[in-house]
Amino acid sequence: MNNKSKIIIYQLFPRLFTNTQPNSVFNGTIAQNGAGKMNQIDTRVLNSLRDMGVTHVWYTGIVQHASKTDYSAYGIHKSNPHVVKGNAGSPYAITDYYDVDPDIAVDVNQRMKEFEQLVQRTHACGMKVVLDFVPNHVARQYRSLAKPKGVEDLGQTDDKGMFFSPNNNFYYITGKSFSPSVDMGEGDDKYVEYPAKATGNDCFHECPGGNDWFETVKLNYGVDPWNGSKHFSPIPSTWTKMCDILLFWAAKGVDAFRCDMVHMVPVEFWHWAIAKVKEQYPDVVFIAELYDVGIYHSYIHYGGFDYLYDKVNLYDKLCAIVKNEESAASLTQCWQTVEGMQAHMLNFLENHDELRLASPQQFGDAELAFPAVIVSATMSTSPFMLYQGQELGEDGKGATGYSGDDGRTSIFDYTTMPLVEKWYSHGKCSIHKINNKARRIRAFYTKILKMCATEQAISQGAFFDLMYVNYQNLNPQKQYVYLRHFDHETLLVGVNFHADDAELEIDIPAHAFQCLGIHSGVCFMKELLSGKQKTAEFSPTAKFQMRLPAHGGVVWKIVH
């Protein structure tokens, strides 16, 4: 991994991204609503992402998962529909860790080859591949038919008469049948599981509810859930099996793994497995989905993760500021919370789990998030991630099936994304069919991402918070200012969460010049988002005049 480049991750779900089926119906089947394919993610699509500033593509929904679509004609085990959420199913209810999902293949029999070709195309276009690794749980009917010769399947040798054994891959509710509160069918259609296995969200009884992850089974990493005791010597078989899965995909050319719900798996496993993978593939990057600031340090410095989701710190704070629930000045607390770890944070404002920025449930307008995007992308050297269609203002409106109208693009249903569909335009990848607002949003994201790629002060530079000397010069409820500096270049970033423009005169303290090694004097300056230029004094005694647009920001580049 090149530590001098700013990582920009684009999350792309092939089943949704290139699906252009017109007139989708509610809760439709794949025959009715269609599905995007890996082969449709061609060089034109990939070049458009690269040209926008993307360095890594996170392909979601690649690994085979539970679905109500019947592929038994291709030798794929058919899922019982009562343990599948939505017609398309959750991409996080894995049915075979060693196989590719048939929905996204043009030729189902060649699905692995189509994935390998996608990896090759992505690399040829100068980007890296990120793949999901789901370590905590599998689909209730997990069964690997594609596993390499000699590989023992999960649960194959489990002693099902024991609730917990360090030699088992699952937890068993002995003497009990699986009896969730949701309908499991009747007669030949009924889903039967005996003994019941523990459910994925740490539900260690036979009766999970509808809001539980009832379609999944919890994996056993050698922790007895009743007393918390750890049984890690000898190495549990689940550890070995899951590490082998990581090595399998790394051998396919996967450059990074986005690891699902890592805090539900013991940090000792990550310490062991990440080291094992990096012995053979030292450049493979590990990204953690993690929601507890208190264990950030452990999962970085002991677990071995390169990057962690900073959801409960920066993401939550930015969303609260846009909604006028917190002050812009409270962003100071965010970098202080992760001080010393900030380079390991993965910043974002959208992914498949979170509300669409433009959704009525979030901000109702993607442009209201512009100042938050500027902060998330430029505050540190850490990676920035965006979700498919975020750059167009997809709003996730309307119910398409299982998910309902929840402000998200459904991952459970066969559906499309209206703005992405217009932009994709059957492979043309053109702005001509999208509306002016979507064009403005895309242009904004392109400027931000390209700036992240080209400005060393963002990708490598130091950070200096200017708020402590400027509370009298701005509205701390709505405005935030900071410096990024590298070598002979300084960026002065100002953002405005207010509905009105703001004219500011900002103080740059002498301590900032000393701390960052900035030379004062008359300098050439350029505002990178608007292109405006000026020559002015940049020193501790000179006020820096800036005009902040409503719901926007500026990035002034000062060349010394």
Protein language model features and the residues they cover:
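Alpha-amylase-like alpha-glycosidases and glucanotransferases acting on alpha-linked glucans and related
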Residues: 3-9, 13, 93, 103-120, ...
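Loop/helix patches that line or flank the sugar-binding groove of alpha-linked glycan CAZymes
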Residues: 20, 29, 67, 82-83, ...
